[in-house]
From Swiss-Prot:
The gene is rplU. PANTHER family: 50S RIBOSOMAL PROTEIN L21, LARGE RIBOSOMAL SUBUNIT PROTEIN BL21M. InterPro entries: bL21-like (IPR028909), bL21-like_sf (IPR036164), Ribosomal_bL21 (IPR001787). Signal peptide: none annotated. One of its GO terms (molecular function) is rRNA binding. Coiled coil: none annotated. This is Large ribosomal subunit protein bL21. It comes from Desulfovibrio desulfuricans (strain ATCC 27774 / DSM 6949 / MB). One of its GO terms (cellular component) is ribonucleoprotein complex. This protein binds to 23S rRNA in the presence of protein L20. GO terms for biological process: translation.
Length: 102
């Protein structure tokens, strides 16, 4: 059985026991979360929501939090000899899917 969920503005295809990296969630590492924005549940019988399935949920465990690689943003203006350098690191959360209900 698999499900397509939405979290952080992105969609993920998950199965029981799978580990995925999503946008940062406000939950402690080791805690259990419920993702209720389920778009589709597939398996022997496929159910599709419009846009979400009512009563469907995916239970997952927060494995850990981390930060992605540093992205450098460089802006330069001609004639002024002006430039600006900024860096950014995106926060993420790794979760492990425990069960799919729906």
């Amino acid at each position: 059985m698999y499900a397509i969920i939405e979290t952080g503005g992105k969609q993920y295809r998950v199965e029981e026991g799978s580990k995925i990296v999503v946008e940062k969630l406000a939950a402690q590492a080791g805690s259990e979360i419920s993702l209720d924005k389920v778009l589709m549940v597939g398996g022997a019988e496929c159910k599709v929501g419009a846009p979400y399935l009512a009563g469907a949920a995916v239970t997952a465990e927060v494995v850990d939090h981390g930060r992605g690689p540093k992205i450098k943003v460089f802006k330069r203006w001609r004639r002024n000899d002006s430039r600006k350098m900024r860096g950014h690191r995106q926060d993420f959360t790794t979760i492990r899917v425990k069960s799919i209900n729906g």
